C-alpha cells in the first residue's frame, strides 16, 4: 500500500480546555508541558541542542524503525529474535486497562494500562486500531506508536519536524485505519 499525502496533513480536533489550562499558571497542564523550556517547549524540541539533553518523560526521541521493533517485540509476547524481554504476565499488564476516564491534564477521555496508553471506552476517535488490547502512546508533536498482539501489528509513525499537537496527526490515523481496513 502506498499513498502520497500532502506535507500538512491536518490535525484532529485538539481539546480546547487543555490549551486554556496550558496558558493558566499553576494548572496541571502548565506544570506538565512547560518545564523546562516554557510555553515553547514543543518547538524547542526541534532544536538539536535541546534534543541532546536527557529530559525525563519529555525527550523520548527515536526512529520509526526503532519504535516499530520495540512494539513488534511487545505485540509478539515480549520476544524478538529468539530472546524474551518481557514475561507473559508483564505483557498482560500492558494490555489490561487499569484506568479509564477523563484525563486531568489532556482534558479528554483516556485509558491507561501499566505504562501505556489505550483507547478510552468512550473515545470519539480510536487511535490504536480496532483491538481492545492494543496499547502504545502518542508522542508530543504528532508521532504515534503502538502494538496490537491480537492482530500481530506493530505501528510507528514519526515526523522529521514536530507539530503543535498532543495527539497523533490525521495522516498517521489514516494509515492506522488503512492497515485495519485490509485485515
Task: Give residue spans per PLM region.
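Structured C-terminal helix/loop/strand segments within mature extracytoplasmic catalytic/sensor domains
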Residues: 138-183
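Short, local alpha-helical segments
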Residues: 51-52, 136-139
